[in-house]
Amino acid sequence: MKAIIAVNNLGFIGKGNTLLWHNKEDLRHFKKLTDGGILLVGYNTFSELPTLSNRGLIIDTRNEFYFDVDWCIGGKKTYEKYSPFFTELHISHIDDNQIGDVTFPNFIDLSADCKIYNYNY
């Protein structure tokens, strides 16, 4: 499974279950990468998501699931829980200094084979 995340200069990924910024370039990048895929999302993140056309959603719960997932799109606990299964990690670095309440996850369990891609917006 691949993962995609956006983080600002201060290490924040969100506030109140939403993004701190609205970066059109990053949103186009997100759509391009995830279009046609099956997305894994945590419940809190799901509750604030807009409709994502041409993508299926699987909402992470405490129960195990046995679906083929293409992308993990957050939130923080979902990233941390599934990070050992990431084959790719796509990180958008947003040039923004807003204070949030959710910080960049601790990916200590990434496999040695996980490829990391960085983008700047």
Language-model segments: residues:
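Enzymes that bind and transform nitrogen-containing heteroaromatic metabolites
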Residues: M1-Y121
